Amino acid sequence: VSRRVRVDYESGDRFRIAVRQHTLSVDQPASDGGEDTAPTPTELFIASLASCVALYARRFASRHGIRTDGLAVTADFSMASHPARVGEITLQLHVPGELSPEQQASLLAVTSHCTVHSTLMQPPEVRLELAALTPGAA
């Protein structure tokens, strides 16, 4: 099943993103020429990974009777160059309460298979195409 996300230019370095019935924005920090009205695309990319891990952790916790209040994921990342890209990501999963060593291993195994993490480990084919111009558009 193919799904679609649409990104439309707003102004400056700001773009509006439409996903199903949801709308969000991206921008650049003022130090990079933007207005800092929204996260950068790279920050959303990292947030996507962290939130995917968090979702899988929540589902695991619920299935195993582990508390979920206070469940959180923090993500630290650094950039690399040539080409510009995210070079390293470190995720820390904060789970309330004590987990046995077996639960810890199981939780890490489950969360490392979240959809976004799996996509990073097995990259999809990415095609960039130029859409046909609308007649009369400049």
Describe the role of every protein-language-model region:
Residues 1-47, 55-138:
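Extended beta-strand/beta-hairpin segments
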